[in-house]
Amino acid sequence: MRMEKTTDKPLSAGDMNDEYSRGPIDDIDCLNFFERAVQDPCCEACDTEDADEELRAKLSSFNFQPDSSPCNAKCQQTLNPLCKIDEGLPAESELAPSRNGSVSEANSDTNSIASTVHDPVDSKYGGMPSLRKAKTTSYFTSSSSNNTTMRNPLKKCNTNINGLLVNRRSSSSSRQSIPELFSGACTKKKNNVLLKSETPNSEFSTNSLQHCNSRSFSLPRSRSRSSAIAIPTHLYGLEKYVSPELDTLTADPEESIERFSNNRPREISSCCPNDTGDTSSSLSHSNTSSSLNFPLGTNTNQFHQPRQPVQQQQSSKPNFGAGRKKSFIEMSLASSFAG
């Protein structure tokens, strides 16, 4: 009975303060429920400077539906004047302190609501904003990872291209070195034929000169046809059979000098007594046989100068290739070069 009388009486100032203090608490719960249902968990990156103004606008436009319970009716009666005050007063008067302190408490409650709504560490939202942050950071760092992954295949392509260029250069140098040796050998044969042209047989010398010229000019053209040019000497270790400089290192110089001194007087004795055309024929025959039997690395100039003394020939460069036995590879190369 006593409670019914109190409800019929008008509320005092202290009771009004209590009711005003209870009202915003229920308001906070409703707003939390509303924000939890509406707010996107992945929108933390949005601008939050004017969040308080948005919350105040939501407070003013939010309609509380009254229920049958007496507590909700009292809250409805107390919240209606608050909404009128918020709508009527400007923004500066909302922040100013009032006599009963209800507006200041409501403002403090709205600030606390803003802090709770936009708190990224709050457990009510399931930690989704932190996951969103991780995604954004991984998105920004993925550009650097993509750059690194793009640089690695570029480096691999560069290394492959450099390796191909080096291989092509080495193969081209090895292929070009052999025709140079051929051209040098043909120039030696040209000199020998020019020395031979002093003899009465001029037809043979001119024919051989034309043959050497045709060979020297046809070598670069038939580079892919000849089997000797296609041999990769740097792979099979055949440089010592092709270049005369490496051939001299493998031979014994003393044996070659002795053999040269033993063979030289016989040729002089066979050439001196006859000054007729027989000597020229024998010289031409010996020259042709020496040029065909000896490989390209041998020095054939020694057979075309019969009147030089033996000491000068010994002081000059000896024939280093004659002091050892010919190998099968050397004979095959010599036959291919001669033919």
Curated annotation (Swiss-Prot):
The modification Phosphothreonine is found at T159. The keyword 4Fe-4S does not apply. InterPro entries: Mbr1. The keyword Cell membrane does not apply. One of its GO terms (cellular component) is mitochondrion. Residues 1-20, 93-156, 199-224, 258-325 are annotated as: Disordered. Keywords: Mitochondrion, Phosphoprotein, Stress response. It comes from the Eukaryota. It is found in: Mitochondrion. It holds the Pfam family MBR1. Residues 99-115, 199-213 have a biased composition (Polar residues). Residues 136-149, 214-224, 279-293, 302-314 have a biased composition (Low complexity). The modification Phosphoserine is found at S177, S224, S227. Participates in mitochondrial biogenesis and stress response. Belongs to the ISF1/MBR1 family. This is Mitochondrial biogenesis regulation protein 1. It comes from Saccharomyces cerevisiae (strain RM11-1a) (Baker's yeast). The lineage of its organism: Eukaryota, Fungi, Dikarya, Ascomycota, Saccharomycotina. The gene is MBR1.
